[in-house]
């Protein structure tokens, strides 16, 4: 910081709200580097080494001929479609197939795996009904 800045800071009464925020000024949970991925590492001598594999690469699809625009106006009318419910999802995906099997008399309640029913969720990464965890 320059000399003039230090003099001006000394003349101002009250809290210094224009000072830069450092880890000493914030709470214990304050981390200056939070929110950005590291793209390298610091050596023991303090030099930063950039690692090419750690740099994020954004893959953007080719949007030539794409009709939609990336901006939705706040003046746009609200959607008219009803929100998705469990019953609506069931009737759109599995319902017609079960109705067809009921009409053909080939429906068996013990053979629900045919329609995508999973009796257990063992081995799944995301469980539908996880147990309550201790907080």
Swiss-Prot record:
GO molecular function list: structural constituent of ribosome
GO CC terms in record: mitochondrial large ribosomal subunit; ribonucleoprotein complex
InterPro entries hit by this protein: Ribosomal_mL41
Major subcellular site: mitochondrion
UniProt keyword list: Apoptosis, Cell cycle, Mitochondrion, Ribonucleoprotein, Ribosomal protein, Transit peptide
The keyword Transit peptide appears for this protein: yes
Function according to Swiss-Prot or TrEMBL: Component of the mitochondrial ribosome large subunit. Also involved in apoptosis and cell cycle.
Complexes and interactors: Component of the mitochondrial ribosome large subunit (39S) which comprises a 16S rRNA and about 50 distinct proteins.
Family: Belongs to the mitochondrion-specific ribosomal protein mL41 family.
Designated name of the protein: Large ribosomal subunit protein mL41B
Source species of the chain: Xenopus laevis (African clawed frog)
């Amino acid at each position: 910081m320059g000399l003039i800045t230090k003099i001006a800071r000394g003349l101002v009464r009250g809290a210094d709200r224009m000072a830069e925020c450092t880890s000493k000024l914030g709470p214990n949970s304050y981390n200056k580097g939070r929110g950005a991925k590291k793209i390298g590492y610091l050596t023991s001598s303090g030099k930063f080494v950039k690692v090419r594999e750690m740099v994020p690469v954004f893959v953007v699809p080719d949007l030539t001929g794409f009709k939609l625009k990336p901006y939705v106006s706040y003046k746009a009318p609200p959607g008219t479609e009803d929100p998705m419910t469990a019953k609506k999802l069931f009737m759109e995906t599995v319902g017609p197939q079960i109705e067809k099997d009921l009409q053909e008399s080939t429906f068996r309640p013990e053979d629900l795996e045919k329609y995508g029913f999973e009796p257990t969720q063992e081995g799944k990464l995301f469980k539908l009904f996880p147990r309550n965890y201790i907080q």
